[in-house]
């Protein structure tokens, strides 16, 4: 009773047929998870911020605080 010979032909093809669909599926799941778990909430947060953001009001507050060198506060 001897040991069975190992299959030496087609090893790469057999492993690729098994692992390639798994790799594509996992990469697709990871990409979709990143898109809907990270980028979409980030885009929504930016949109919510800029709905209420007033650039002129912010500029005037920084001008009055004396942050800018080229623009004097309105009191001077």
Swiss-Prot record:
Q: Which residues are exposed on the Mitochondrial matrix face of the membrane? A: 2-10
Cellular location of this protein? Mitochondrion inner membrane
Q: What is its main location?
A: mitochondrion
Q: Where are the transmembrane segments?
A: 11-51
Example GO biological process = oxidative phosphorylation
Q: How does it sit in the membrane?
A: Single-pass membrane protein
The answer to keyword Mitochondrion applying to this record is: yes
Please provide, in alphabetical order, the Gene Ontology terms of the cellular component aspect for this entry: mitochondrial inner membrane
Q: Which family does it belong to?
A: Belongs to the cytochrome c oxidase subunit 6c family.
What's this protein's name? Cytochrome c oxidase subunit 6C-1
UniProt source species: Thunnus obesus (Bigeye tuna)
